[in-house]
Amino acid sequence: LEELTHEAWILREQGSGTRLTFDQAMRHHLNSLNVRLELEHTEAIKRAVESGLGIGCISRLALRDAFRRGSLVAVETPELDLVRQFYFIWHKQKYQTNAIREFLDLCRSLTAGVRRSDEIVLPSIA
């Protein structure tokens, strides 16, 4: 972990959920981090890291193809808590259609028991 604090970091912008999770996990090291770039899009972070500008912290699901191609590799950090929760929200007075209920059920079934985003198996669209 100490080695990571000396690297050039490419991160999401302040206020994004990913950045909040990262900042909380690295809270004891924030003063010593070298943040080279703050970008608003995950794809931009991937491209910057692939170009050798630094290291980043984004969802494994977003990186699945880059890992498969071998253009990026994961740095395992079991000592960091990088878990992030997502919630479904909707207007309390809006009617939920069958399609919305089916979509929510599908999302719950795809993520049941999943510990990391790259463990989600997305169905192919024919």
Predicted regions mapped to residue ranges:
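Secondary-structure junction motif
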Residues: 7-29, 96-98, 104-105, 113-122
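Alpha-helical segments flanking ligand/cofactor-binding loops in enzyme cores
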Residues: 2, 46-47, 101
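A late-sequence structural motif
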Residues: 73-117, 125
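Hydrophobic hinge/microswitch elements
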Residues: 20-74
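Acidic, Gly/Pro-rich loop/turn segments at junctions of secondary structure
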Residues: 1-10, 14, 61-62, 79-82
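Proline- and acidic/polar-enriched loop/turn elements at helix boundaries
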Residues: 16, 38, 60, 78-79, ...
